[in-house]
Amino acid sequence: MKRIQRKRTKGWKMPINTKYVGRPTKWGNPFRVEDLGAEEAVKLYKECILNNAMCYSYMDVREARIQFERFKWMAENLEQLRGLDLACFCSLSSPCHADALIELLKINNKT
């Protein structure tokens, strides 16, 4: 299991056994890098999946309610990603929420 950088270049194809987890998908990170920086956005994303109630000071009440259900779903369905490579447009040298998903799967594997 590894992170793949998805590309928009002509002829690029996503490898077999790879799941795109970018922003428009149900696995996307709602915390924007432009607002928080990459490290903080990834950290909050991971914390929200681990402990759903901890991360809503950055959101208004309506958005927090929506994201609560979304992160709850992610925590309950994380195993769907096991054994897949995860693709996102983030540079491989930058922090990415796909790495957080991979880390969480490794943690779940140990318990």
Predicted feature residues:
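Catalytic phosphate/metal-binding cores of nucleic-acid and nucleotide-processing enzymes, i.e., regions
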Residues: M1-T111
